[in-house]
């Protein structure tokens, strides 16, 4: 088996396209069964970029969680938070830039990740509870010598980071945040999904109402944009 990356279209003929192809690891042959993922790099920091790292565990109220720790020469640490259904591999695209800058980093897991403790509800809470795990990771970084933190959130990780900024007493240790396609209003995201599927608006509203009762979803609490003026740290948004 192997891991390869495909890029831009080089040639398109009818229903066929020839794309850039780069083998990053192992060996792949014509006819091999493959699957696609969006991360663009294999495995872990060492496999992806040759970056030495330690697989550490930090303690949260829900239990112990795994994280990749990469050392650096600076005392500002970067904490990276992946999105829903993703993994720490989502951060590999940015990790080499962080390492080149000399910044230590911590790429974390949180409740309901594979191998991690589950949320008491059994479901993702889109930042309502996961921010506690981010806070625990921040406490770990500060205990290890971080003077301040830059926090990166991908997709649902952006919601986790935002609620951390609203809820955590450690917000004054945050030098800045980076959002990569953050999901900051779950209700609006569901509405857009319905529009993209040409569903009548009232059907989406009914579905949200039913799911709110069925899964105890507080749609208003998941609108992190409603009090965005409370965020006082610098934000870089992609």
How should each PLM-predicted stretch be described?
Residues 84-98, 110, 117:
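The serine-hydrolase catalytic nucleophile loop
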Residues 163-221:
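Hydrolase active-site cap/lid region
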Residues 27-73:
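N-terminal cap/lid segment of alpha/beta-hydrolase-fold proteins
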Residues 1-37:
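N-terminal accessory interaction module
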Residues 230-232, 236-238:
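Short beta-strand/loop motif that positions the catalytic acidic residue
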Residues 123-144, 150:
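Alpha/beta-hydrolase active-site loop
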Residues 153-157, 161:
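Gly/Ala-rich beta-loop-alpha elbow adjacent to hydrolase catalytic centers
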Residues 75-83:
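Short beta-strand element of the alpha/beta-hydrolase
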């Amino acid at each position: 088996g192997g891991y390869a990356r495909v890029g831009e279209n080089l040639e398109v003929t009818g229903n066929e396209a020839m794309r850039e192809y780069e083998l990053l690891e192992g060996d792949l042959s014509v006819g091999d069964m493959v699957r696609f993922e969006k991360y663009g790099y294999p495995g872990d920091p060492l496999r992806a970029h040759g970056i030495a790292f330690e697989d550490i565990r930090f303690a949260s109220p829900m239990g112990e969680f795994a994280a990749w720790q990469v050392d650096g020469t600076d005392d500002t640490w970067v904490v990276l938070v992946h999105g829903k259904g993703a993994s720490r591999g989502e951060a590999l695209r940015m990790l080499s830039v962080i390492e080149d800058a000399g910044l230590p980093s911590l790429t974390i897991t949180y409740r309901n990740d594979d191998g991690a403790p589950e949320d008491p509800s059994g479901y993702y809470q889109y930042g309502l509870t996961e921010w506690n795990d981010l806070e625990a990771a921040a406490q770990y970084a500060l205990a290890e010598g971080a003077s301040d933190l830059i926090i990166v959130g991908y997709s649902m990780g952006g919601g986790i980071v935002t609620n951390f900024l609203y809820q955590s007493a450690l917000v004054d240790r945050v030098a800045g945040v980076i959002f990569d396609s953050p999901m900051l209003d779950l209700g609006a995201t569901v509405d857009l999904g319905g529009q993209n599927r040409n569903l009548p608006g009232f059907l989406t509203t009914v579905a949200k109402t039913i799911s709110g009762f069925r899964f105890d979803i507080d749609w208003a609490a998941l609108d992190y944009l409603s009090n965005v003026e409370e965020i006082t740290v610098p934000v870089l948004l992609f």
